[in-house]
């Protein structure tokens, strides 16, 4: 959960020029201080992309195999058909060019124990738009409770093929294999999970200060329920996961690094770009307003991904490197994606839902030399991650704050 105060866009200390001319007609009537509609804000600075790098490490296959032998494997389609929660919306979200939305059940809508962050869809997984024959949305939540037990990250599996407006869903707990091959176990994944990206059988989860955690849907396990405080292998040989019925294991990690004196990139969000060649991953970082005011850079990068093994793709020298990088200096960026060379950024504006100027903003720019264009109050309060569905031209996002947790899509081409 992150907060942002409304103020003029910080201009980079490198001397980015502010462009104050209007660039579009307002789409709704708002207070003069927060006039809606697109407006050109500031230029974007290209960076040396190859200075952003990754190193792959994998969970020992023998350990994953031992858990495969100990636990029943199930398919994503099985989990999607096993939804145990039904959403209910009390109102519709105010979203510019809105095309779809749904909610959570009352417990998930109001809880302060978990906060939703990342979103990805089966249109990321496969270009057909379905996985196991179903349209599925995945949303990550991080444990926000102060109960002495850090349960890590859970992922909501929503079955939109069953109902587009009220998809039944179930939470799956992310876990990291541990123990030995003779006594295999697992533990929670204690990260913020600010971004989520699904590619084939792999689920990429943003690890703020570490790069990406990767989870394999070919190893989706059913575990015992009935104990809300137990995790992993128990003394009687049973396996539990805080009363969640299914767990998804981490099978790989991409640890990030930099060269050329660049500061480490915060991995605050991640999305897939299927409109690039090859397919690629878009990563952006969150910086608070005070950090930007103090001169912190805010950057976004593009990294190619290989459709054959679903891993980030190395360059010809064998090193995994970004191929595009930009400095935007946008404060409070919560999500990003790219569509046909145009970048999109969601920006949160605090949690005061009674103030329409607390609604999230959407920013765009056309790479490589376009200026940032602000679409004021286009998203909901607490706007988070972004994901693009090219099969329907849906730009998905979601809200994080209790009581205002819509999951919604807008018509991407309208921005």
Language-model segment annotations:
Residues 2, 6-107, 411-415:
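Sequence/structural signature of beta-propeller modules
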Residues 66-112, 167-187, 227-264, 311-329, ...:
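Surface-exposed loop and turn segments in beta-propeller and other repeat-based domains
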Residues 102-129, 139-194:
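Blade-loop segments of beta-propeller domains
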Residues 109-133, 189-199, 261-280, 329, ...:
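Structural signature of eukaryotic scaffold interfaces centered on beta-propeller domains
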Residues 124, 135, 280-384, 391, ...:
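Loop/turn-rich, solvent-exposed surfaces of beta-rich toroidal or solenoidal domains
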Residues 138-139, 204-206, 283, 345, ...:
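Conserved beta-strand element within WD40/beta-propeller blades
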Residues 150-163, 216-237, 294-311, 357-370, ...:
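Beta-propeller blade signature
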Residues 173-177, 184-195, 201-302, 331:
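Eukaryote-skewed repeat-based solenoidal scaffolds used as protein-protein interaction platforms
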């Amino acid at each position: 959960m992150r907060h942002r105060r409304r103020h003029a866009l910080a201009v980079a200390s490198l001397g980015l020029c502010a462009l104050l001319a209007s660039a579009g007609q307002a789409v709704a009537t708002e207070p003069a201080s927060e006039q809606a509609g697109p407006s050109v804000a500031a230029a974007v600075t290209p960076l040396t992309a190859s200075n952003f790098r990754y190193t792959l490490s994998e969970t020992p296959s023998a350990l994953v195999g031992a858990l495969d032998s100990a636990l029943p494997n199930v398919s994503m389609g099985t989990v999607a058909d096993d939804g145990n929660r039904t959403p209910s919306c009390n109102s519709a979200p105010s979203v510019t060019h809105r095309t779809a939305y749904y909610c959570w059940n009352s417990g998930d809508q109001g809880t302060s124990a978990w906060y939703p962050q990342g979103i990805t869809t089966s249109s990321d997984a496969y270009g057909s738009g379905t996985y196991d024959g179903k349209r599925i949305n995945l949303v990550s939540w991080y444990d926000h409770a102060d109960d002495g037990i850090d349960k890590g990250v859970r992922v909501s599996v929503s079955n939109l093929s069953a109902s587009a407006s009220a998809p039944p869903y179930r939470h799956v707990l992310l876990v990291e294999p541990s123990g030995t091959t003779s006594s295999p176990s697992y533990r929670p994944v204690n990260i913020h999970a600010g971004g989520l990206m699904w590619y084939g059988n792999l689920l990429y989860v943003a690890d703020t200060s570490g790069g990406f955690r990767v989870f394999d849907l070919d190893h989706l396990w059913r575990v015992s329920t009935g104990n809300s405080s137990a995790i992993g292998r128990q003394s009687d040989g049973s396996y539990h996961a805080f009363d969640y019925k299914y767990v998804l294991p981490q099978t790989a990690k991409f640890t990030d690094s930099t060269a050329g004196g660049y500061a480490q990139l915060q991995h605050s969000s991640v999305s897939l770009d299927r409109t690039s060649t090859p397919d690629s991953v878009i990563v952006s970082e969150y910086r608070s307003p005070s950090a930007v005011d103090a001169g912190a850079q805010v950057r976004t990068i593009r990294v190619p991904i290989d459709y054959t093994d679903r891993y980030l793709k190395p360059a010809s020298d064998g090193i995994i490197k970004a191929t595009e990088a930009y400095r935007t200096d946008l404060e409070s960026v919560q999500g990003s994606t790219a569509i046909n060379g145009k970048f999109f950024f969601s920006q949160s504006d605090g949690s005061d839902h009674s103030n329409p100027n607390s609604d999230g903003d959407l920013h765009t720019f056309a790479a490589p030399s376009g200026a940032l264009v602000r679409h004021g109050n286009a998203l909901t309060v607490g706007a988070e991650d972004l994901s693009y569905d090219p099969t329907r031209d849906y730009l998905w996002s979601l809200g994080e704050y209790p009581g205002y947790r819509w999951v919604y899509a807008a018509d991407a081409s309208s921005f």
